[in-house]
């Protein structure tokens, strides 16, 4: 089922346009993403459960988190996880609810999603998060030391396909240069314009080919 939904203030995510990369006579596309969610809050709000229960053997699931996974753990937006990809956990008293909650590492949540997909006989494809429009010395900022690294580690630990979307799109933006790169974002350094969403979707298609993932057979 194809979904093309414009985000608030003309911000677009690649999930709204990824269907344009596929032959829709061969495959259907379901965009289950929700703005502002971390891996933890996507699980806590029951959004992952809906994905899990809808999965059928042979489905492909693109999984990407990272932009909303830093910050406060138990105050404010309270959506961050523990940093890293290990098995650590810690109990926090949540300011908003007054209840205690066990919080795990970013990698733990990704591994749970991946293993849930595998349990259903579906195929997980894990993506590093899209690059931010932040530059230093003519180079765009990468996430290789934090969320990108932890995403790769979660994929490697579970045998999932991994696409370094951060690198693929960042390489494209660097070739365009800092001035032209601004056209791919919308009023901040994180949220993409429609043009940026299409670029990231094409980068995913490139990544599927690079990873030799069977989903590539359904590309246009």
PLM region spans:
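Short, conserved active-site loop motifs that form the nucleotide-linked donor/cofactor pocket
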Residues: 4, 27, 160
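Short, small-residue-biased leader/transition segments that mark boundaries at the very start
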Residues: 1-8
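A short beta-strand-loop structural module common to alpha/beta enzyme folds
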Residues: 25-38
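Short catalytic helix/loop segments, enriched in acidic residues and glycine
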Residues: 9-24
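Short, solvent-exposed loop/turn segments at secondary-structure boundaries
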Residues: 9, 42-43, 137-142
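Alpha-helical cap/lid subdomain in secreted, periplasmic
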Residues: 50-192, 198, 202-220
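N-terminal post-signal-peptidase region of extra-cytosolic proteins
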Residues: 38-50
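Active-site phosphate/pyrophosphate- and oxyanion-stabilizing loops and adjacent acidic/basic residues
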Residues: 16, 20, 49, 152
